[in-house]
Amino acid sequence: MTTTTVFDLDRFARAAEERDASTQLSMYGPEATVTIADRITQPGSPRVLTGTEEIKGWIEDVAARDMTHSVTHRVSGDSSAAFTLACRYPNGTNILCATVIEVEDGAIAKQIVVQAWDES
């Protein structure tokens, strides 16, 4: 009998909202990749993080920032998940991230993040 490990999107979302970097990181596979596209690292040359050490630095940086995080629009399936993440700094600057995740053996294998923020 084969057992399938399901990705717990609710747990991941809770960790993001609570800025719990350790729990978030524990949900990535050892060879995971995260691709980030935004105004600075545009789609033609996105930022690509490979492996949990590189991903750890990014997650810890985001979790340490003084901002609120709210996960919305969650969708999950057997081997994928997606959500939006709305963030806000105390000065009122907003960030919106759309994320698509590919899951293997219950862990994040690939993640694509597209983010935009207020500019004044």
Language-model features: where?
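A beta-strand edge to alpha-helix "cap/lid" segment located at domain peripheries
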Residues: 56-120
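A solvent-exposed, acidic/Ser-Thr-rich amphipathic alpha-helical stretch
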Residues: 23, 27-76
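Short, low-complexity N-terminal intrinsically disordered segments enriched in polar/charged residues
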Residues: 1-26, 30, 120
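Generic helix-packing signal
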Residues: 17-19, 36, 115
